[in-house]
Regions:
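Extended beta-strand/beta-hairpin segments
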Residues: 1-96, 106-191
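Alpha-helical metal-binding/catalytic segments enriched in His/Glu/Asp
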Residues: 98-102
Length: 191
């Protein structure tokens, strides 16, 4: 899968073109298996939890690098019982992850086609009936839609091309996870 950017360009919008080119050549056209891992533990007080982003495997090659060792502290709004607003709420984090994933996909594609971005942002919104959440009942019908707006700017690029570029974000992994029904398997370990 070739990149149409000039061979003289080493970087587009902060993305190193030789590394991007090598990545696309390595993954080829076939299926690419990417295994991701996260571990979340309750912090023993209120709704505080800490998520640890672990190693990943790409095509069976496990990457255990310090660069993949991130921690996210979660909590809920201070207005909720037992909460101190010491970190983002889990649903807000999903919305933020969606925006970040759309930006990643759009920025990579922009670099791939040689578009130098000046601005790129995503605003994500969701409304839902929280009654099911508070009553601990089936909430599947309480979530109706997630909406997002992409703001994109690049000099010397037509509005049509920018619109096409912004639509690439719909193919990001988080968009796909949220927009299709997916099997969620659970295992309960009681100690």
């Amino acid at each position: 899968m070739g990149l149409p950017v000039s061979a003289k360009q080493d970087e587009v919008s902060g993305i190193p073109i030789p590394k991007l080119r090598a990545f696309y050549e390595a993954i080829g056209d076939g299926p690419v298996v990417l295994d991701l891992e996260a571990y979340v533990e309750w912090q023993g007080r209120g709704t505080r939890a800490t998520g640890h982003i672990g190693p990943f495997s790409l095509m069976g090659d496990r990457k255990e690098r310090l660069t993949r060792s991130y921690t996210i502290r979660y909590d809920d709004w201070a207005e909720m019982p037992g909460c101190e607003d010491s970190g983002p709420e889990a649903v807000e984090t999903v919305l933020s992850a969606l925006g970040a994933c759309i930006i990643n996909q759009t920025a990579w594609h922009a670099a791939r086609i040689g578009v130098v971005l000046e601005e790129l942002s995503v605003k994500v919104n969701m409304s839902f009936d929280a009654q099911g959440f508070f009553q601990n009942t089936d909430q599947t019908d309480k979530f109706s839609a997630i909406t997002y707006e992409i703001h994109i700017k690049a000099t010397g690029v037509s509005k049509r091309k920018l619109t096409e570029l912004a639509n690439v974000g719909r193919n990001c992994p988080v968009c796909r996870m949220l927009s299709k029904e997916m099997v969620l398997k659970s295992k309960v370990l009681v100690h």
